[in-house]
Each structure stands twice: as structure tokens, then as C-alpha cells.
A protein has these predicted regions:
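Ligand-binding pocket scaffold of soluble enzyme catalytic domains
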Residues: 353, 398, 429
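Acidic, glycine-enriched loop/beta-strand segments at the rims
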Residues: 273-281, 287, 332-336, 344-378
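Short loop/turn motifs at secondary-structure junctions and domain boundaries
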Residues: 240-241, 344, 388-391
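Hydrophobic alpha-helix feature that most strongly marks membrane-spanning transmembrane helices
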Residues: 87, 120, 152, 252, ...
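Divalent metal-coordination and catalytic microenvironments
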Residues: 49, 160, 255, 302, ...
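C-terminal cap of metal-dependent C-N hydrolases
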Residues: 289-296, 301, 313-315, 364-419
């Protein structure tokens, strides 16, 4: 193991384990006996070292056949009962992927009250990610007000705030919104070199443009799935920092169809260019306000999910390069605290986050004048040659984990000093 990791126990996992019948976990409420068994499993996981309980209520989390994941069909009473186990143990954190309450203020408030009461009644910290959206720019502030409201009632709640837009990256090296259309599907089966040759054929290119603009029956994309592009918000990521031009702007400038422009831009870069589609956090003033809130923590990641679609590992280097060095919106000291002590404190790890005798020796050695994310790259090093996105950084000379130099100037030193960091109940044994 290279880095220090932790684990939570998920509601989906405990449901599937206890109900045994996979289909029942996705369609039926547990019986009284099954609910008691789920609570036993949750306590067992906490005593084995889990740092908390996680669950999902968001429509973005579906099975491959488009059905809700098991936790989405659970009642809120089931969630309360399971979180109550953590309250009884006086340990652990509750992480939740939020319900979509829509734009109805009453529905939003009803959900926020449930979240608040969950934190207050259980006595356990509740956390979730929050973003702004160009489609609903007023959705996020009430959730930040909720943090203060919960604290005033004796509960603990914090929001995980991203440091930039949350983007889906698409490219000829990975996936495009048109891949499922027959003429595109035939092209995309070929090697990158053969795709490039095909795209230079004006006859084939015309067919591709026509196909992409056709009236296709398409289901609404969820999460990081490909969807029909919004060209006014589809940007050419030809550099890390930008500014990035939109495909719509380039199409108007060149007097061509947006799909034609995407093909042209890709050919100009030998097909090695990303188009980024922001899903959330388009307004960077909103991003900064969320980061600065005293009850937010600057962190967010889908971890092992969407590895060929989303690249969030540059969240921290973006804080240091963009918000500190380029914008001057944060001091270096503020930013370092946001990225180290505040997450450690929020998740209850009081042995790390500071450089102090007796604390965990996890350090990043960087040059404030040079630290920055590099361009994402595509690698095919997962099992069966599956692809993933990788993003490295400039200006970091060393990464120290548990007192050992793990990375030096961007290269792995060959040591594996990471460990599974267990929660307080396991540590107390």
C-alpha cells in the first residue's frame, strides 16, 4: 500500500449481505430480523476499524441496468436506525450522497430538516458534498445555512467543497457523447491512428457530423455518463489552467457545425485533447465562497469511480496554484490548513494534519512558486487493459508517508509505507 487509507461501511453493502437475495436488496425493505442483523454487521464493521457509515440517496447512483442502488430504496427510518448504531457507539462519521429535492423550497426544507435531525439525534458528524449549478444557482446557500443551524442545536455537520468545476473529460482516447451511434461506433472500434485517418476523409466526416446531429432516442445521462453535449458549456481543454474556449464559440468563429469543430480541434492535436463538460461549480465565485465557509472542508473525490471520465486528484494542487498564487484569494497558510489540518480534524484524526512531534509524518514538500497540476493523461494499465485518467503535478519534490519518501520529483521510490488507518473503536482495543 502506498498511501494511508480509511474505510466506511456502506448501507448498500450491508443490505446486500444480510438480505442475501440480491434482487430483494434492491426492491424490498428488510424485515425486523434482517434490520437487527444489519445493525449487528454495522457495529462489527465499526469495531473492526471502519471510520463511519455511508449511504446514497442520489439518483446519480444506479445499477448497470438503470435501477436505483439498494440504499436509494431504503426508507429514511432505516437510515435513522443504522445511524443510531453509531450514536450508541459514540463513534464514527455519517457520509451521505444527498437526495435531489428539486427546486421546490418546501421539499428542500423537509430534506434539510431530516439531515439536521439526523445529526442532532445521533450526536454523530454528518457530511456530504455540495456544489453550485448554473441550472439552479440558488440551491447551495441554504445547505450552508443548515450547517450553522445544526451547530446551534448541538449537532455536527460539515460540507465537502470542491476547489473548481466538477468536469467530465471526454476525448477520442476515452469516450465521446456520440460513441453509441452506429457510424461512430464503427470508427471508434479502430486504433487511434486509424481513427485519425478516417476523420480526415471528408465523406466519412460528413456522415459522422450528420449522425451526431440526428434525432436519436437517448436516455437522460446520470452522474458522469456521456450525454448530448451542451456546446455553450463544452470547453476545449488544450491547457490545464485555461482560459478554455467553448466549442460553441469556436463554431461561430469558424462558421462550422459544433461537431465538425470538435473533429477539427481533435485532429489539430493528433486526437490527444480533452473536451471538458462542467457538471457543477461553473461559477468560481460560488466555489470560493463554499471553500471559505468555516464549516466546509476542501475535499472531494469519487475515489475509484469514473476513473476514465472524471479527474479530481488535482483538487489540492489547484488550490495552491490557482486560488493562492494566481488569484491571491487565499494565503498560502490558509490553503495549507484547508488541505491538511481541517480534513484531519473533521474526520476525527487528531494525530495528523500538523507538523509536530508525535504526529504522523505525512508531508508534501513543494515549491509555492511552481506547484501546479499537469495535463491529465490516459493510461491503459487497469485489469484487461482498461483505461484510466492520471494527473500528475509540477513543483512537488517529495511526498512523505509515515516518515518514508514515497515519491521524489514525481517518481515512485519503490517503498510502500501506507497503511489502513482504523477508526477509534478498533484503535481502542
Amino acid at each position: 500500500m502506498t498511501v494511508t487509507e480509511t474505510a466506511t461501511i456502506s448501507e448498500k453493502l450491508s443490505q446486500s449481505q444480510i438480505l442475501r437475495d440480491y434482487e430483494r436488496a434492491f426492491s424490498e425493505a428488510p424485515t425486523g430480523d434482517e434490520m437487527r442483523a444489519m445493525k449487528v454487521e454495522l457495529e462489527s464493521a465499526m469495531r473492526a476499524g471502519a471510520i463511519g457509515f455511508s449511504t446514497s440517496r442520489t439518483r446519480n447512483h444506479q445499477t448497470p441496468d438503470g435501477q436505483p442502488v439498494a440504499s436509494r430504496v431504503a426508507t429514511w427510518d432505516e437510515v435513522r436506525e443504522l445511524v443510531g448504531v453509531l450514536g450508541d457507539l459514540d463513534a464514527g462519521i455519517v457520509e451521505i450522497a444527498n437526495e435531489e429535492a428539486g427546486r421546490d423550497p418546501q421539499a428542500q426544507r423537509e430534506y434539510q430538516v431530516r439531515l439536521r435531525d439526523l445529526a442532532v439525534e445521533s450526536g454523530r458528524p454528518v457530511t456530504f458534498g455540495m456544489f453550485s449549478s448554473r441550472r439552479a444557482p440558488d440551491i447551495w446557500p441554504p445547505y450552508f445555512d443548515l450547517l450553522d443551524e445544526t451547530a446551534a442545536m448541538g449537532g455536527r455537520m460539515f460540507i465537502q467543497a470542491h476547489s473548481r468545476a466538477l468536469n467530465v473529460l471526454m476525448s477520442f482516447e476515452t469516450r465521446l457523447p456520440f460513441d453509441k451511434f452506429p457510424v461512430w461506433k464503427e470508427l471508434r472500434k479502430k486504433s487511434l491512428a486509424d481513427q485519425e485517418a478516417g476523420l480526415r476523409d471528408p465523406v466519412l466526416r460528413a456522415r459522422l457530423v450528420e449522425s451526431a446531429n440526428g434525432n436519436h432516442e437517448e436516455k437522460q445521462g446520470v452522474g458522469a455518463e456521456m450525454r448530448r453535449p451542451d456546446y455553450d458549456w463544452l470547453l476545449v481543454m488544450d491547457s490545464v489552467a485555461g482560459p478554455h474556449r467553448t466549442v460553441a464559440d469556436l463554431a461561430r468563429e469558424r462558421g462550422k457545425d459544433p461537431v465538425e469543430v470538435m473533429i477539427e480541434v481533435a485532429l489539430e492535436h493528433k486526437l490527444k485533447v480533452f473536451f471538458r463538460q462542467p457538471l457543477f461549480n461553473e461559477d468560481q465565485d460560488h466555489v470560493l465562497a463554499m471553500m471559505r465557509h468555516p464549516r466546509s472542508v476542501v475535499t472531494f473525490s469519487d475515489s475509484g469511480a469514473h476513473v476514465s471520465q472524471i479527474m479530481d486528484s488535482s483538487l489540492q494542487t489547484h488550490v495552491l496554484s490557482h486560488w493562492v498564487r494566481e488569484k491571491g484569494a487565499l494565503s498560502l497558510e490558509e490553503a495549507v490548513r484547508m488541505l491538511t489540518l481541517e480534513p484531519a480534524t473533521a474526520w476525527g484524526f487528531d494525530d495528523r494534519g500538523l507538523i509536530r512531534v508525535g504526529m504522523a509524518a505525512d508531508l508534501i514538500v513543494f515549491d509555492p512558486a511552481k506547484v501546479a497540476p499537469l495535463m491529465p493523461e490516459v493510461r491503459h494499465d487497469l485489469p484487461a487493459g482498461a483505461r484510466r485518467l492520471v494527473q500528475k503535478a509540477a513543483g512537488i519534490s517529495a511526498t512523505v508517508v509515515n516518515g518514508q519518501v514515497l515519491m521524489r520529483n514525481g517518481e515512485h521510490t519503490g517503498v510502500y509505507p501506507g497503511q489502513l488507518l482504523r477508526g477509534p473503536l478498533a484503535a481502542a482495543r
